[in-house]
């Protein structure tokens, strides 16, 4: 049967749909263009004229414009902008600790939120190397001669970041056999010196951990009970292995037991801890380490959930900074091989030496896993008696709302 393909009910249905779409389109155009009435607009608010005109290609100035220099500049400027945001978040967290606001535990969520934001930014910075790696070594070599003596080591913000988090000056790898600050002059040098004299995030977290509820000898006395349980558990473990028939497997288990025993008993040797602290192998005070371990073991308890998340974020930051350094090393090796850096350093070899625990700030938190024990060795708590697990400390004089935070 033939006929008009547009006859029948289908026409009404189609027209109806078109009518509905027209109505939706009309609704989408009912807004008001407030920008036309004057006032602050997008470009002015973001200062885009300054930002988007801040890319001066040295190759172009020298009369030999190289395309990939633009990518090189943009990528490093993006890094510096994100470093600025990280410092902004870090300074706000340090201020919360310094002013004693953490004594009101309601403020810990704000601390945790901002530190998590730093973690997310660092993840972005680690991934950002993949953009720069779209440039080949030959492409980079085309404009490298125009960069000297500029160097990534001269990033003031990254050095400030290291100092404010808590990188030990005594553990820094010398740059061309000089103190790192000697590569900065004037106001930059003074800013770095000031940042060395301020309380670091590590020191502030250390003081906070020392106040962990449950460490009090006349209270729950976690450390005393934990040591007692460890000694009892080790004795039971020894007798269990000793009761087995002589065999190669028994010898292996006994050797492993002795190693575990040495590690666990060293945990209760305060003098040894202080010695390792003086060498830079440990970073937290003895009591702060106790607090961190207590939070680690009781992380599922209501009062310790946010503190545990904070400790996890601190480890994430350390890990991501190490990954950032490593990615930087790999990129430099790929672009320069073993040649000297543009700033005069040994390049790849210098950068490679910075990818180590020397630059890890919260290394003690990573090492907590060394002290994992069977759950029944962990001191038990009675929630009826030990109400501190469910009763947070708060003080109206220490609490501040979002409006008062900055």
From Swiss-Prot:
InterPro entries: Trp/Indoleamine_2_3_dOase-like, Trp_2_3_dOase. One of its GO terms (biological process) is response to nitroglycerin. It catalyses: L-tryptophan + O2 = N-formyl-L-kynurenine. Coiled coil: none annotated. It holds the Pfam family Trp_dioxygenase. GO terms for molecular function: amino acid binding; heme binding; identical protein binding; metal ion binding; oxygen binding; tryptophan 2,3-dioxygenase activity. Its EC number is 1.13.11.11. Heme binds at residue 328. Induction: By dexamethasone. The keyword Iron applies. Its cofactor is heme. The modification Phosphoserine is found at residue 19. Binds 1 heme group per subunit. Pathway: Amino-acid degradation; L-tryptophan degradation via kynurenine pathway; L-kynurenine from L-tryptophan: step 1/2. Substrate binds at residues 72-76, 144, 342. Liver. Keywords: Dioxygenase, Heme, Iron, Metal-binding, Oxidoreductase, Phosphoprotein, Tryptophan catabolism. Gene3D superfamilies: 1.10.287.3810, 1.20.58.480. Homotetramer. Dimer of dimers. Belongs to the tryptophan 2,3-dioxygenase family. Heme-dependent dioxygenase that catalyzes the oxidative cleavage of the L-tryptophan (L-Trp) pyrrole ring and converts L-tryptophan to N-formyl-L-kynurenine. Catalyzes the oxidative cleavage of the indole moiety. HAMAP family: T23O. This is Tryptophan 2,3-dioxygenase. It comes from Rattus norvegicus.
């Amino acid at each position: 049967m033939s006929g008009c393909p547009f006859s029948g009910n289908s026409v009404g249905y189609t027209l109806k749909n078109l009518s509905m779409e027209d109505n939706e389109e009309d609704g989408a155009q009912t807004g008001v263009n407030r920008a036309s009435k004057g006032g602050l607009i997008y470009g002015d608010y973001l200062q885009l004229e300054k930002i988007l005109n801040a890319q001066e290609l040295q190759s172009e100035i020298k009369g030999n414009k190289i395309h990939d220099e633009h990518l090189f500049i943009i990528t490093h400027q993006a890094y510096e902008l994100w470093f600025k945001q990280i410092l902004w978040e870090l300074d706000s967290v340090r201020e919360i600790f310094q002013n004693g606001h953490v004594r009101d535990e309601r403020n810990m969520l704000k601390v945790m939120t901002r530190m998590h934001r730093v973690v997310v930014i660092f993840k972005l910075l680690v991934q950002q190397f993949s953009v720069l790696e779209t440039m080949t070594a030959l492409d980079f070599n085309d404009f490298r001669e125009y960069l000297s003596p500029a160097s990534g080591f001269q990033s003031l913000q990254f050095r400030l970041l290291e100092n404010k988090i808590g990188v030990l000056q005594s553990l820094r790898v010398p740059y061309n056999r000089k103190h790192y600050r000697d590569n900065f002059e004037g106001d930059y040098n003074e800013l770095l010196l000031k940042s060395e004299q301020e309380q670091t995030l590590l020191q502030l977290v250390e003081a906070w951990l020392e106040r962990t509820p449950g460490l009090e000898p006349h209270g729950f006395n976690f450390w005393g009970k934990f040591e007692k349980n460890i000694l009892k558990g080790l004795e039971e473990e020894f007798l269990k292995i000793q009761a087995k028939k002589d065999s190669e497997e028994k010898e292996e288990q006994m050797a492993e037991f002795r190693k575990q025993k040495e590690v666990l008993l060293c945990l209760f040797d305060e003098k040894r801890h202080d010695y390792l602290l003086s060498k830079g192998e440990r970073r937290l005070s003895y009591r702060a380490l106790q607090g961190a371990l207590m939070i680690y073991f009781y992380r599922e308890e209501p009062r310790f959930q946010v503190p545990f998340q904070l400790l996890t974020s601190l480890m994430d930051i350390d890990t991501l900074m190490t990954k950032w350094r490593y990615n930087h090393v790999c990129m430099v090796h790929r672009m320069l091989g073993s040649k000297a850096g543009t700033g005069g350093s040994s390049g790849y070899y210098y950068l490679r030496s910075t990818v180590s625990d020397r630059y890890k700030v919260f290394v003690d938190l990573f090492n907590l896993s060394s002290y994992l024990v069977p759950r029944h060795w962990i001191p038990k708590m009675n929630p009826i008696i030990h109400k501190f697990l469910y009763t947070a400390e708060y003080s109206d004089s220490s609490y501040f709302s979002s409006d008062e935070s900055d």
